[in-house]
Amino acid sequence: IFSQRFYIAESYQSCWRCKKITPVFGVFLPRWFSYRDVVCGVKPAEWEGRILDKWYETSSPRGMVYFDSKKNIIYQWLTNPKAWAILSNVRRISSSALSIINKHSKLYYPAYSKTAKMTYYANHCCHCKSMQGDFMMFDEPGGVFYPVTSEQAKKIKLHEVINETIFANANHRQAIE
């Protein structure tokens, strides 16, 4: 994922282990962020009329596409002009973006999640240092960064990061505006 600008989201939640309130942070991307997508197991019949084994531009969605006829894979580098996104399960992040995030929280660092069975950058409780898993915060409706009411959304404070790009290997989903 790449974006020419980003926002650090800040909120608070109860730690699952010690039950004390702890600050948590996330990364929001504004419209026009770019992301890479890989589609495996594509049937050659679905490629009819496509340019094979060469990158080419597309207009809808806007970006670049490569149909690999030898591996039956589609590689896409797309731009999202319509919606904001929030990152989760961040496996890698550019060092300059991470240093800005760490100015807000020293408790955002890589840890292994037994639930997700992977290592990713995660929030940790400021009291007991327990990892605060991304799923409940970012992917579960009603989670701190997945508000379902305007009252929940008002609890999120956005810090705009100016003049800094972000590169990340992460999941993303459309953020509710």
What are these regions (language model features)?
Residues 1, 87-111:
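Short, charged low-complexity linear segments at domain edges
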Residues 41-93:
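Long intrinsically disordered, low-complexity regions that are acidic and Ser/Thr-rich
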Residues 30-41, 138-151:
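Short cysteine/histidine-rich metal-coordination sites, predominantly Zn2+-binding motifs
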Residues 117-126:
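Eukaryote-biased detector of low-complexity, proline/serine/threonine-rich segments
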Residues 15-18, 125-128:
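Short cysteine-rich clusters marking metal-coordination/redox-active sites
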Residues 24-25, 131-135:
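Short, non-ligating residues that shape and space the ligands of small metal-coordination modules
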Residues 9-12, 122:
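Residues immediately within or flanking Cys/His clusters that coordinate Zn2+
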